[in-house]
Amino acid sequence: MANYTPAPEDDYDVFIEDDLSDDEIEPCTPYDPKILSAQLVPYLYTTVFMVGLLDNILVVFILVKYKGLRQAENMSFLNLALSNLGFLLTLPFWAYAASHGEGFDDPLCKILLLLYSIGLYSEAFFNVLLTVQRYKEFFHVRRRFSACRTVAGSIFISVLVWVTATLVTLPELVSYKPQMQSQKYKCFFTGLHFLPADETFWKHFLTLKMNILGFLLPLFAFVYCYVRMRKTLQFRERNYGLFKLVFTIMAVFLLMWGPYNIVLFLSAFNEHFSLHGCGSSYNLNKSVQITRIIAATHCCVNPLLYVFLDKAFRKHLCHLFYLCSDTAPQPTEEPAQGASGEEYHLSS
């Protein structure tokens, strides 16, 4: 097994993957990620960065100026946009590293890993929070948690989620450090040598942590809440626009990050699935890189979903660019306690 693991500048896994240049058990040519990295990643990541930066800043502006942050869901939408922006800030650096074949020295190595990881985990957690908020609204349990729906309560929960996402990324932060390789710095996984466990254990631990917190937890929340809501007659009879938006955002997140998490799991535990042969290793390494590139583009998708599924957002966007002739909308007030999510959504 390799002593180090390349980080995203090799356009491989930021968390746990083995060095792709290692010799396999069978004599064969290993997969070289640098070919696809140099040809595709710089252009794709730069495009995603520019598009994502523009549309997520627009989301933040519209939420703050027009829709207001008095409703708990709007606060969560704002935090989702901030999560995307944090993730986006790392893409130009990975694009540069892919095109030049080199990484970064301290402290930039750890800063980029921190932004990348916090952006990913915080988006997963805020997606879960939004889903649970819609679930409680649907089954009219809002009054039991009325304190959580105040501005102060929403801010407290948001801070708690950000702190949790930061704490979750600490293992990556302490286990990565820049190393010199071929007279170039690389941001490598070196393991947690101050704890009594070998590198294989931490490789499996970090993989399972990402799979559980970044994929299985949102998947469970999505399936449980959606199935329970789908069974009720009210859900089938009424078209809840805000419900549709929240669950579509979660579904897209799962669809874009799901393949990467599955392939990552198979790659980390390949010895348990008889996937350590030459051909299997080659295909797994290639799949990890491709699915990771696809997943990294998710951070510019949410604002597009707002445009297609949120009438109020389209109206505010229209007024912002002077495409509408009627009077510009005013900032939205918090709905009354008895108002439904749909009534607020259509009037905001």
Curated annotation (Swiss-Prot):
Question: What are the GO cellular component annotations?
Answer: cytoplasm; external side of plasma membrane; plasma membrane
Q: Keyword Nucleotide-binding on this protein?
A: no
Output one GO MF annotation: C-C chemokine binding
Question: Which cysteines are disulphide-bonded?
Answer: 109-187
Record Gene3D superfamilies: Rhodopsin 7-helix transmembrane proteins
A Pfam cross-reference name: 7tm_1
Q: Which residues are glycosylated?
A: 285
- CDD domains listed in its UniProt record: 7tmA_CCRL2 (cd15171)
Q: Which residues lie on this side of the membrane: Cytoplasmic?
A: 65-76, 132-150, 226-244, 314-348
Keyword terms of this UniProt record: Cell membrane, Disulfide bond, G-protein coupled receptor, Glycoprotein, Membrane, Receptor, Transducer, Transmembrane, Transmembrane helix
Function recorded in the entry: Receptor for CCL19 and chemerin/RARRES2. Does not appear to be a signaling receptor, but may have a role in modulating chemokine-triggered immune responses by capturing and internalizing CCL19 or by presenting RARRES2 ligand to CMKLR1, a functional signaling receptor. Plays a critical role for the development of Th2 responses.
Q: Name the family.
A: Belongs to the G-protein coupled receptor 1 family.
Know anything about its domains from the record?
A: Lacks the conserved DRYLAIV motif in the second intracellular loop that is required for signaling of functional chemokine receptors.
What is the official name of this protein in its record? Chemokine C-C motif receptor-like 2
- Native source species: Bos taurus (Bovine)
Corresponding gene? CCRL2
